From Swiss-Prot:
Belongs to the peptidase M20A family. N-acetyldiaminopimelate deacetylase subfamily. The active site is at D69, E128. It comes from Bacillus cereus (strain AH820). The lineage of its organism: Bacteria, Bacillati, Bacillota, Bacilli, Bacillales. This is N-acetyldiaminopimelate deacetylase. The keyword Cell cycle does not apply. One of its GO terms (biological process) is lysine biosynthetic process via diaminopimelate.
Amino acid sequence: MAVSKFVQIRRDLHKIPEIGFKEWKTQQYILDYIGTLSNEHVEVKVWRTGVIVKVKGKNPEKVIGYRADIDGLPITEETGYEFASVHEGMMHACGHDLHTTIGLGLLTAAVTERIDDDLVFLFQPAEEGPGGALPMLESEELKEWKPNIILGLHIAPEYPVGTIATKEGLLFANTSELYVDLKGKGGHAAYPHTANDMIVAASHLVTQLQSVISRNVNPLDSAVITIGKITGGTVQNIIAEKSRLEGTIRTLSVESMSRVKSRIEAIVAGIEASFQCEAVIDYGAMYHQVYNHEALTREFMQFVSEQTDMKVITCTEAMTGEDFGYMLQEIPGFMFWLGVNSEYGLHHAKLKPDEEAIEKAIVFLDQYVKWKGTRK
């Protein structure tokens, strides 16, 4: 059965997921597609493994930006797709293949029928880590094309196709990675008194960290500490000299993030004293909260509700992390959820977004951009 042009693009991209700042094939695919548009009004810049594209307007007064993240995840795919990932251990499990496809569709529409204002498309690498939004924002390549307004989307498996969901103000949480390395003294399992067991130390640390949320964060605020991975030890009869905890911190307020980190550091110091070990904390990458510009978001929601076929839902804040928050710190704009109706959620090996959402998104975003970027 034949599929539409942009569904095929999505499937092509789905087959070649690549992790942060290694998206060479994805970058080339984007460049090759843009090359087919070959228009005198299109300018292209390459930034690391990303692509920045400008469509010059007929009578520009402002620059409207669309950001699409392009990277995949280190997940082994279990969708059963005929077009499943050909890169072992990697998958587009967060919908960035759809985000990119929608961006290319919107770009195509912009070239076909130019508007008054300039349009800039940011095909951004490394959203899943270590973070591409901030360095792209600060790059020389973007400096002269910096948008005055910027928008981004993220697929939402829980919402049906034909819907978007967003809200004014805070949409996504502050997030930070968390790594704790513990080093004690190894030894024989028969002589525990001669060793400092880092498996036991790690176990105590995990349970104590949960008290940070229940006893140190305002109940009217929200915060989550998740330890997703613990490693330590070599075999069953040797007391572990080292262990490592890996997780994330998520808070709705900047103040809570600071408070949570302070309490983590105090608890880790207590573990060091209790188990006579050494501990090193590394917070890795941190993403700023996604805070939607109130007036622009309100205007967008009203436009979509009244002038397109899409249904608009006012959602609540999510503990999701997104480095698009850095762009919204400097550029007025907004992000929204796009319904894709999948049984399985984001970062799941069986995530299967409904491809019907692609064409719907391209159509209504083209309507919005033409309305926003044309002199009345």
